[in-house]
């Protein structure tokens, strides 16, 4: 099995967290998002412990809410010692509704509106990650009106290419996020920020990309950031207390993907940071990381019912399911790989070479192509593994399809965390 929280029971059914997925689909319906809370907590603890043991005091992980965001998630994150990265008022509202402390929220975004800024400040969000000069001016003004000094980190781009998908590569110079170091613009960005009397500049933020399997790209980013920090100390006497290195550690979607050693990578990163600071006689800053995918992806799976099975002679066979790009658009967007298994027939020989297609009126609505399954029958159950990240949050109502329910599994019990949408929900905002 791809992950240790998955198994096959005596009936030949896939289990997650010890629960039969066939029984889950019968109780809660399908399509169905399933999130293993025990696996989620284990992933949180891996990051919290690794940062606590290897980085300076005050270092901790911030969960990237863009990967998965619903109210019931945030109490778990808070209990496990996580902070949270939020990118919209909606994510802020969801986190606060889940009882998450506002001071542990870090607000991202390359185009925060005046309304966004006002809502975040009035909600007492702890820190803003500032993307550009215009935002600096607006934050300074908004903080002044409220009589506060707002904590900020400055997002800079180090010009790193971690060799990941172009769509998720965010560290290169030509990118809509942050201010580039190499062009000299980041130096002017820092000077501007330090001149703002209502802002407290705590340090720098960078994000180099996603699906990174080793520490080296992060170490390269640290080298560039430390050189930049040293230059800013010499120019302004400013010493960065915090380096936020963003997210990016990858997960296994296929058996062929490498295993990612999160503690080992963090340990290597910490050693590299300490060495770099020692060489420059620079105080070692606390480190924040922003894992999203690597916290929730392998804790989640999606269950589908098989509908039609169609073989086009001389070409291929299609197995259609009762979901698709509306609940997982990632294959349609960029051919994202997933492992698909016959959840109700795990022990059957997989002799059928096929493509799994969704139900949308769209030729690109595919889940995976050219995979092996048993000869499928209508109402068989399929499971797509490692869907905890960027499925629920990227879901849509295309073709006016209702979004699936989300169930959390914990200590051998399942509970409904997000109900399935109804037709009434689809027209609730229509006038």
Q: Across the structure, where does each feature detected by a protein language model lie?
A:
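A charged N-terminal "starter" segment
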Residues: 1-151, 187, 191, 195-200, ...
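Structural preference for beta-strand elements that scaffold enzyme active sites
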Residues: 60-62, 81-83, 102-106, 127, ...
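Conserved residues at the C-terminal ends of beta-strands
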Residues: 108, 131, 207, 246, ...
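Active-site-proximal loop/turn and secondary-structure-junction residues that shape catalytic pockets
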Residues: 67-69, 90-91, 111-113, 132-134, ...
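Short acidic, glycine/serine/threonine-rich loops at helix termini
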Residues: 73-74, 97, 117-122, 139-142, ...
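Charged (often Lys/Glu-rich) extended helix/loop segments that serve as interaction or gating elements
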Residues: 268, 274-277, 282-431
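Active-site loop/helix belt of alpha/beta enzymes
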Residues: 3, 159-308, 373, 401, ...
């Amino acid at each position: 099995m791809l992950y240790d929280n998955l198994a096959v029971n005596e009936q030949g059914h896939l289990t997650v967290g010890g629960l039969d997925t066939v029984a889950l689909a019968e109780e809660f319906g399908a399509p169905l998002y399933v999130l293993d809370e025990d696996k989620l907590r284990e992933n949180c603890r891996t990051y919290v412990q690794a940062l606590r043991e290897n980085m300076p005091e005050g270092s901790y992980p911030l969960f990237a809410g863009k990967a998965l965001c619903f109210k019931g998630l945030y109490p778990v994150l808070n209990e496990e010692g996580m902070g949270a990265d939020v990118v919209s008022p909606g994510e802020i509202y969801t986190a606060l509704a889940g009882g998450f402390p506002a001071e542990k929220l870090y607000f991202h975004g390359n185009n925060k509106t005046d309304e966004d800024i006002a809502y975040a400040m009035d909600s007492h969000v702890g820190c803003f990650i500032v993307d550009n000069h215009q935002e600096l001016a607006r934050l300074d003004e908004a903080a002044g009106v409220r009589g506060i000094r707002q904590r900020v980190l400055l997002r800079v781009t180090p010009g790193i290419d971690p060799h990941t998908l172009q769509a998720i590569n965010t560290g290169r110079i030509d990118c809509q996020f942050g201010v580039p170091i190499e062009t000299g613009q980041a130096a002017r960005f820092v000077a501007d920020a330090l001149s703002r009397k209502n802002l407290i500049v705590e340090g720098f933020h960078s994000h180099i990309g996603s699906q990174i399997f080793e520490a080296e790209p992060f170490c390269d980013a640290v080298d560039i950031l430390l050189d930049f920090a040293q230059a800013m100390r010499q120019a302004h006497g400013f010493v960065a207390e915090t380096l936020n290195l963003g997210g990016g550690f990858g997960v296994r979607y296929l058996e062929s993907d490498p295993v990612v050693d999160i503690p080992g990578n963090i340990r290597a990163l910490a050693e590299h940071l300490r060495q770099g600071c020692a060489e420059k006689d620079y105080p070692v800053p606390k480190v924040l990381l922003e894992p999203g995918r690597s916290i929730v992806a392998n804790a989640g799976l999606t269950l589908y019912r098989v509908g039609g099975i169609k073989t086009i002679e001389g070409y291929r066979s299609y197995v259609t399911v009762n979901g698709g790009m509306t609940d997982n658009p990632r294959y349609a967007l960029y051919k994202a790989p997933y492992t698909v298994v016959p959840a109700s027939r795990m022990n059957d020989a997989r002799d059928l070479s096929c493509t799994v297609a969704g139900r949308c009126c769209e030729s690109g609505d595919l889940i995976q192509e050219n995979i092996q399954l048993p000869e499928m029958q209508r109402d068989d159950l399929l499971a797509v593994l490692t869907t905890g990240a960027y499925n629920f949050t990227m879901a849509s109502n295309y073709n006016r399809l209702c979004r699936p329910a989300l169930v959390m599994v914990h200590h051998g019990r399942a509970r409904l965390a997000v109900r399935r949408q109804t037709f009434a929900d689809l027209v609730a905002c229509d006038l």
